[in-house]
Amino acid sequence: VSDTARKPNHQKKVVTVLEPEDEYTHEPDEAENYNESMYLNAFDAAQEVGGWFRLGNRVNEGYAEMTVCVYLPGGRVGFDYGRPHIDTNDKMEAGGLSIEVVEPFKHLKVRYEGKVCLLDEPGQMADPRTAFKENPWVECEVDLDYRGVSPMYGGKPQYEDGTELEVEAEKSFAKAHYEQHCAVTGTIRVGEETIDMDGLGLRDKSWGPRYWQALSWYRWLPMTFSKDFAMMISIVGGKPGGMVLEGDEYHIIRDCNIESDWDEDTYQTAMRCSVTTDHDTYEVTGEVISLIPLRNRRQDPDGNELFTRITEAMTRFECRGEKGIGMSEYLDQIVDGTPVGPDVRGTRSHPRP
């Protein structure tokens, strides 16, 4: 037995590990809320169009979370969400959406064949039942190739001797997570409209127990300016994080601040970010182009209704005179009708679910 193995966990060194096989699915934990999810976004800055696609396998609960969101010209959004049945975690394919790893860390494919709800006013999705009922559904086809333009960021934290960190399933959001900026080519068709995509984006993957209520709030800003200048800025419960891509190297964000503007629904409309790495400092401004509000609800063991709001906005960014595009994704738990994020400023309470 090594000296490291004899040490109590609190004295062991934690390292982050990422292997090519992590791009594929894992053997699920026993936790009921085990989640293995892949998310990919793509944007064309010149056209100010794009979208994001997510599959979250919850095989121990018997379903996948499947989301397709396409940002169209003029602020319109094509959107679908479903919980298709799954009984295996062997692949990322459900509800018409598939994510294929062609070559780990280098090349992935995203395909979707199905329908999306076409929203002229995406804010209607605050009441999804009504929005899905009152807006038209149109055919949608997605065929995109993602090729990495950056190193990998993140992985699975574990002790240096290879033993796993203990994760409390009820309070977990993920036990492993990584991200990568990508170049994206292909097509997105919504109804009679076709987007020829030659743009940039970011992808991520997580696995491990997840409840959407495990985090009280976060602000997540993935953005791209070019193939060799991009960022992911995050504040999770007050803790700064993320990275800046300069050339072919990631520089870890050591500190950041995000100051946001809000509308009467307490949805973000713009933001100003200060970012510090070991090498440089950056000032970034963002302006929301199109936003759709989403939610997740569940009951805790005591029967209390828990309500999570996630506002998903295609956002134009500017830094050092360079124009870029990406997302501003803001997650808040809603308590007594109010988002809990300490930065939220607005006038309207949200009705209890």
Q: What does each model-found stretch correspond to?
A:
Residues 2-353:
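Structured soluble/peripheral alpha/beta segments that form catalytic or ligand/cofactor-binding pockets
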